[in-house]
Amino acid sequence: MKKDILTEINVYHTVLSPQRGYNIDNKKIKAEAVKGYVLSAKRMEEKDCWEYKDYKFISPCTELSFLDTAIKDEFFAATKKSIKLKDRWVNIYEHLEQSYSRNSLYLNSYAESPWYTCIYCCDVVKDSSELIIEYDNVTKINKLNKYKIENNKLFIFPSTLRYFFSENFSEDPNIFITHTYNLNI
């Protein structure tokens, strides 16, 4: 009997650590991320939009390019596919705050939508929140998969998947950097 795989959804995750050859100074990245938050440099000014809580980088630091290279290297090692950065933004969730359920698609133009979403846990309190990814499988609709967060942890998944961050139970804010990528074809 032959088998044809029609769909396969993968979520790639790892921790970028010095033992893996990555020495990313996330304090510098955090400083730039917080700057956009403090100056209220929002990606979208409409309060009814889920992008209202997304903040721009005011002046991206060199560490962000190191992070981007690490993400590309990790993805290539896992998939043998090359990706290029499309967009990047910051999300900061205070005590008892959670995010909206969203995906990274451009609903008015699927052709312009990114292929992959990458979440980087820049400065988080371990186990204070979870990344929750929603997906459909053959037998269930809106199935949830929960992932623990920790500093320097990286998640890469298709941009069609909806995701959100659960409530932050820590007294400290959790800082996430979201990247979107296209395939280099």
Predicted regions and their residues:
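Aromatic-acidic/polar surface patches that form glycan- and anion
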Residues: P60, L64, A111, K148, ...
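A short hydrophobic beta-strand segment most commonly corresponding to one strand
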Residues: T117-I119, L154, E171-I185
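Exposed regions on extracellular, virion, or secretory-pathway luminal proteins
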Residues: K80-K81, Y147, N168, D172-P173
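Residues at beta-strand starts and edge strands
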Residues: E8-N10, K84-K86, P114-Y116, P173-I175
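Solvent-exposed residues in well-ordered beta-strands and their adjoining turns
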Residues: S17, Y93, C121-D123, T180-N184
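Non-heme Fe(II)/2-oxoglutarate
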Residues: M1-S82
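Hydrophobic beta-strand residues in large extracellular and virion-surface proteins
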Residues: I29, I71, F75, V90, ...
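Catalytic core of non-heme Fe(II) oxygenases with the double-stranded beta-helix
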Residues: D87-I156, T160-L161, S166
